[in-house]
Amino acid sequence: MAERSQHLQDVFLNTVRKQKISLTIFLVNGVKLTGIVTSFDNFCVLLRRDGHAQLVYKHAISTIMPGQPVQMFEGESSE
C-alpha cells in the first residue's frame, strides 16, 4: 500500500485540534482571531470560541501562534 505523505500544516493543525490547544490566528488584513481548531480541510479552518464557530479560509491566514508549545512528532522535546 502506498504511503501518504503528510504536509506540515496538516500535522500541525491535527495536533492542535486533538490537544485542543488555543490558537491566535492573524489574517493578512491584520485581524486577530483566537480559538480552538475543531476541523480543517485543504481550504479552510473551523475555529471555535465561546460557543461560536468561525470558518476561516486558509488563503486569508498570515500567521498561527499556539498558546502553548506543540509537540508534533514523537520523541520531540518541548522546550
UniProtKB/Swiss-Prot annotation:
One of its GO terms (cellular component) is cytosol. GO terms for molecular function: RNA binding. One of its GO terms (biological process) is regulation of translation, ncRNA-mediated. Pfam families: Hfq. Coiled coil: none annotated. Keywords: RNA-binding, Stress response. Residues 10-70 form the Sm domain. InterPro entries: Hfq, LSM_dom_sf, Sm. The keyword Zinc does not apply. PANTHER family: RNA-BINDING PROTEIN HFQ. HAMAP family: Hfq. NCBIfam families: Hfq (TIGR02383), PRK00395.1 (NF001602). Homohexamer. Belongs to the Hfq family. This is RNA-binding protein Hfq.
